[in-house]
């Protein structure tokens, strides 16, 4: 590329001079400063690449000269193009590839190809009271962008924990200067006792696989101009069972003992961490004998149908891929807590029952009192007695106080006299003649009293 490291004359005002390239690169730079944003620029093959350059000075300048050189390792720098003030003098071999717009010292490379990779040197000379020079070097790399990587797993059917191994390989169709990195759950994977990598880092070996190796794996591929990440892939690892335990929806659990209320139906659930899912079996233990009562992860026990108050069970989990199994023992104790709760519930309702009973008693009493007031049963009885025939009254005898009590049946009527001390009781029989005069008033009173007794005096002999 370009001519040798000797410069041609640039105009009559500068005069004729020749020097070697390395002398130009290390010229004086007092009062002149050349800067570049980055000393390394990465370009994409087939695209344009812009190399920005800035310079400044503080002295009067009559002429500004800009020179671009290109060098590769172990080769001499080659001239690309130069300018004095606004006049550009390109190398005819590359006049359509490199572009510069003085006094701007930046360089445009279009299109960028792999041979364009190397070091680009820019030198600025200022002519005034003297000549000031400064230069910068920019390293340019050229790459193809990375295409999306694809990860393959071997064996694709999976591996058994502590028995099988697994290999993950990252494939990329396009890209240069590729750098591979493996990620697990979004974090970098490092070398360990089970992880190892190929020299290019595009292959990950896991030997042997364990449950902890389960996760989302991806391959990140990058180069100076791009990066791409593969789709997430999860290796299949068979493990377990781990952490076998039994839980229930009811009852109290203390250790391996479940306390269940009498009359409750309790559902037990047996679970363990495993892949693929386990096969569960429920075993009942009685009198040193065991027998399988059910298959599946759940068991329902109806406590009211169980004759024993204490029952022993075993839940067994088996993984048919790993060939491992585990079991857990537990005891079920049936108590009468449910009945006590029911009795307490009845006691809690007793005040309400008492109030209800008292209310019913009062209502019934009021109804009976109302019926008694309305119909008065004693009057009915009296009317029936008064309506008896006279023959029954004739049978009644006077009260003498000495006859047999069986002969005293009859109807009596007693009268209270105002003067009890002055009047003596007169029997219902006839009064002697000696007493008739003194007891006339009394007799008439007695007669009025006893006249209510039908025909009792007529039947008495005179």
Curated annotation (Swiss-Prot):
Tissue: Widely expressed.
Domain (Ig-like C2-type): residue spans on this chain: 149-233, 235-331
Annotated GO biological process: cell division; centrosome cycle
Residues annotated as signal peptide: 1-31
The record's account of how the chain is modified after translation: Poly-ADP-ribosylated (PARsylated) by tankyrase TNKS during late G2 and prophase, leading to translocation to mitotic centrosomes.
Main location: Golgi
SUPFAM superfamilies, per the entry: Immunoglobulin
Membrane topology annotation: Single-pass type I membrane protein
Gene3D superfamilies named in the record: Immunoglobulins
Compartments where located: Golgi apparatus membrane; Cytoplasm, Cytoskeleton, Spindle; Cytoplasm, Cytoskeleton, Microtubule organizing center, Centrosome; Midbody
Pfam families with a match to the protein in the record: Ig_3 (PF13927)
Record flagged with keyword Lyase: no
Glycosylated residues (UniProt): 85, 129, 165, 320
GO terms under cellular component: centrosome; Golgi apparatus; Golgi membrane; intracellular membrane-bounded organelle; midbody; mitotic spindle; nucleoplasm; spindle
Keyword Glycoprotein assigned: yes
Cystine pairings recorded for this chain: 170-219, 270-315
Membrane-spanning segments: 352-372
Stretches in topological domain Cytoplasmic: 373-462
Superkingdom to which the source organism belongs: Eukaryota
Keyword terms: ADP-ribosylation, Cell cycle, Cell division, Cytoplasm, Cytoskeleton, Disulfide bond, Glycoprotein, Golgi apparatus, Immunoglobulin domain, Membrane, Mitosis, Repeat, Signal, Transmembrane, Transmembrane helix
Purpose of the protein: Required during prometaphase for centrosome maturation. Following poly-ADP-ribosylation (PARsylation) by TNKS, translocates from the Golgi apparatus to mitotic centrosomes and plays a key role in the formation of robust microtubules for prompt movement of chromosomes: anchors AKAP9/CG-NAP, a scaffold protein of the gamma-tubulin ring complex and promotes centrosome maturation.
PANTHER family tied to this protein: HEPACAM FAMILY MEMBER 2, HEPACAM FAMILY MEMBER 2-RELATED
Official protein name in the record: HEPACAM family member 2
Organism: Homo sapiens (Human)
């Amino acid at each position: 590329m370009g001519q040798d490291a000797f410069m041609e004359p640039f105009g009559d005002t500068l005069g004729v001079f020749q020097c070697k390239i390395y002398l130009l690169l290390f010229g004086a730079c007092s009062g002149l400063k050349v800067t570049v944003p980055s000393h390394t620029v990465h370009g994409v093959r087939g695209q344009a690449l812009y190399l920005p350059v800035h310079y400044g000075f503080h002295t009067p300048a009559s002429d500004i000269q800009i020179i671009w050189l290109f060098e590769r390792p172990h080769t001499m720098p080659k001239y690309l193009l130069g300018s004095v003030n606004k006049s550009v003098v390109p190398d005819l071999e590359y006049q359509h590839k490199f572009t510069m717009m003085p006094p701007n010292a930046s360089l445009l490379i279009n299109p960028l190809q792999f041979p364009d990779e190397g070091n680009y040197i820019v030198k600025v000379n200022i002519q005034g009271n003297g000549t000031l020079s400064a230069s910068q070097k920019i390293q340019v790399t050229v790459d193809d962008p990375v295409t999306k990587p694809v990860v393959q797993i071997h064996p694709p059917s999976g591996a058994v924990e502590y028995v099988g191994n697994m290999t993950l390989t990252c494939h990329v169709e396009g890209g240069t200067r590729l750098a591979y990195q493996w990620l697990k759950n979004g974090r970098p994977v490092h070398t360990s006792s089970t992880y190892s990598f190929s020299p290019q880092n595009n292959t990950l070996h896991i030997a042997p696989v364990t449950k902890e190796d389960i996760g989302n794996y991806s391959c990140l591929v990058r180069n100076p101009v791009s990066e791409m990440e593969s789709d997430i892939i999860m290796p299949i690892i068979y493990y377990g069972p781990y952490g076998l335990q039994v839980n229930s929806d009811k009852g109290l659990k203390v250790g391996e003992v479940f306390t269940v209320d009498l009359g409750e139906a309790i559902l037990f659930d047996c679970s363990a961490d495993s892949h693929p899912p386990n096969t569960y079996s429920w075993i009942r233990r009685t009198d040193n004998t065991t027998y399988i009562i059910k298959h599946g992860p759940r068991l329902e026990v109806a406590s009211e149908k169980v004759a024993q108050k204490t029952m022993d069970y075993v839940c067994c989990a088996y993984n048919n891929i790993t060939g491992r199994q585990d079991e857990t023992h537990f005891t079920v104790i049936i108590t009468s807590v449910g009945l006590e709760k029911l009795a307490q519930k009845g006691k809690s309702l007793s005040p309400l029952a008492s109030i209800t009973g008292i209310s019913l008693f009062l209502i019934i009493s009021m109804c009976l009192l109302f019926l008694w007031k309305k119909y008065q049963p004693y009057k009915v009885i009296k009317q029936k007695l008064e309506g008896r025939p006279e023959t029954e009254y004739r049978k009644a005898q006077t009260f003498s106080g000495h006859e047999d009590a069986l002969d005293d049946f009859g109807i009596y009527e007693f009268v209270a006299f105002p003067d009890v001390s002055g009047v003596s009781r007169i029997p219902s029989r006839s009064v002697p003649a000696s007493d008739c005069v003194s007891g006339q008033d009394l007799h008439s009173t007695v007669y009025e009293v006893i006249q209510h007794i039908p025909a009792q005096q007529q039947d008495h002999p005179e």
